[in-house]
Curated annotation (Swiss-Prot):
GO biological process, one term: tyrosyl-tRNA aminoacylation
Name this polypeptide is given: Tyrosine--tRNA ligase
Quaternary structure annotation from Swiss-Prot or TrEMBL: Homodimer.
Biological role: Catalyzes the attachment of tyrosine to tRNA(Tyr) in a two-step reaction: tyrosine is first activated by ATP to form Tyr-AMP and then transferred to the acceptor end of tRNA(Tyr).
One GO cellular component term: cytosol
Annotated residues for binding of L-tyrosine: Y37, Y175, Q179
Sites where the protein binds ATP: K238
Family of the protein in this entry: Belongs to the class-I aminoacyl-tRNA synthetase family. TyrS type 1 subfamily.
Pfam families named in the record: SYY_C-terminal (PF22421), tRNA-synt_1b (PF00579)
Chief place of localization: cytoplasm
Lineage top rank: taxon: Bacteria
Amino acid sequence: MASSNLIKQLQERGLIAQVTDEGALAERLAQGPIALYCGFDPTADSLHLGHLVPLLCLKRFQLAGHKPVALVGGATGLIGDPSFKATERKLNTADTVGEWVEKIRRQVSPFLDFDCGKNSAIAANNYDWFGGMNVLDFLRDIGKHFSVNQMINKEAVKQRLNRDDVGISFTEFSYNLLQGYDFASLNKQHDVELQIGGSDQWGNITSGIDLTRRMNQKQVYGLTVPLITKSDGTKFGKTEGGAIWLDASKTSPYKFYQFWINTADADVYRFLKFFTFMSLEDIDALEEEDKNSGKAPRAQYVLAEEVTRMVHGEAGLEAARRITQSLFSGALQDMTQDDFAQLAQDGMPIIELENGADLQQALVSAELVPSRGQARTMISSNAVTINGEKQADPEYTFSASDRLFDRYTLLRRGKKHYCLICWKA
């Protein structure tokens, strides 16, 4: 992605929601590499899909020759950003936030290149400059540059200020000052000239631009990426089981892969522009091919493979493919013990059974049928499989040969209703 027309290319991919002084920023980028940053507050022990677009935007800038700074908010994570939040955030302990900072730092690192010469990435933590700052210095050196009149008129906090039942604490109200100072501090330390973030961060970004101009007498810029929405109006990055996390121990590579496989046709080509590094020409060609093939579109599989490989690596992608193929075909011999553990992690219904349990009991316990009588009917009609093999004997009792890795049995009713049996030792 060439630096000279980077803004235009980002716009063509739909990746810019707002930008300050677009002409001046484009001109500055054309003059040569800049340093830019994006902040990630540790509000949980993992980043989620909502963080992926700004994180990949950092990578896009680095690929164009610019120097990215990934800022983890060890200090701001202790306060909580009120932007467009209906209620006050729960304050987490310093120890908890400290643990989350390290996890998120490790999560961000694989996306950027920290050893590529002049534009090598930098990892920073804003606790480094806020941790030793006393309240008098904060108020005198930072607070004096902020107008309360302007702060209360920012859209990000207006809704809270106008609600008598919730309001906003001074703690969260001060967040804007902290993030603003991040920009000024990074500008002074690393000559950072651009902040990027989600569109909900616009108010915080413009505060940082104003503060940097006042404190450092430097012109800097801001750019936001859009809030990702789905064509049906539902929230992106959420499932019935909750958020889709980037941490494999919270959302397995298989579930992550399936999330992308299930992307609607109306969204998939747009998501390829947001979440992959495929060229626009290749995405357009894929869309044209899908329209003319008369078959199920390939785009979902391309999207799932590209993003899963990027987040979970080749091994994670291979595991996701293996589980998907095994469940689809019913041939489980290729699945590993870790693959079964992924299914258990992903929320597949699980029951524990004692030795000697029969098939009818298992179907009822798994709530795949309401009664033993219904279980008999389902079994007799060849609607039940054990580890991918049909079982038509209503009186069937499980044996040791049904246990995969001496631990698991996969039960299925019909085509889509699964349960994983975990046998008690």
